[in-house]
């Protein structure tokens, strides 16, 4: 499976665009648009707990898509373990632009960092004798993002999709018999792993 997940700029752009569309449909941010358009502010993104930071490029992309003139300066790297009250990024630009993008940026950052942080806690508890693996039980269309977060937290990615390996489970066995399932898997193996649960 993929040992290092690389999220392309276009992938990140597309996901952020969907999130902004969801947040701003149909009339934009009517409250933030009440602010004076020229007021420039600087905001600090501070982590409120010890965490593994992940999803900074999603957060940055939210601000950039709302206003290309917003400056988002990343102070930590994705996968960094940060202490409580650490400065993660600074944002400078028009107040209304920053407030329009803020929630989408924070939602991505909180969700992805939350998965990475929780994974890291489990990895530390498990020690070196076992691996913490993630499954396909992910939010539809966000699997790559969630598996990226697990990887940053020190976890291991299991199957990305149904074609990665043969995984014969109780539901398969209930619909057939284990002997024929395993026999057919061996015939069609084509270099894929076969697992029976």
Tell me what each language-model feature is.
Residues 1-197:
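Acidic/glycine-rich phosphate/pyrophosphate-binding loops and surrounding catalytic core
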């Amino acid at each position: 499976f993929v040992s290092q997940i690389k999220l392309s700029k276009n992938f990140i752009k597309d996901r952020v665009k969907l999130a902004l569309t969801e947040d701003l449909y149909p009339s934009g941010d009517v409250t933030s648009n009440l602010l004076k358009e020229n007021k420039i502010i600087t905001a600090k993104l501070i982590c409120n707990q010890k965490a593994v930071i992940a999803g900074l490029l999603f957060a940055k992309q939210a601000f950039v898509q709302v206003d290309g003139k917003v400056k988002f300066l990343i102070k930590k790297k994705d996968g960094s373990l940060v202490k409580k009250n650490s400065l993660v990024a600074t944002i400078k630009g028009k107040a209304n632009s920053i407030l329009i993008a803020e929630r989408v940026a924070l939602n991505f950052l909180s969700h992805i960092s939350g998965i990475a942080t929780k994974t890291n806690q489990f990895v530390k508890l498990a020690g070196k004798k076992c691996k913490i693996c993630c499954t396909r039980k992910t939010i539809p269309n966000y699997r790559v993002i969630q598996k990226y977060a697990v990887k940053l937290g020190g976890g291991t990615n299991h199957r990305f999709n149904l074609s990665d390996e043969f995984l014969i489970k109780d539901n398969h066995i209930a619909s057939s018999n284990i002997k024929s399932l395993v026999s057919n898997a061996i015939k069609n193996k084509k270099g894929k792993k076969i697992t029976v649960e």
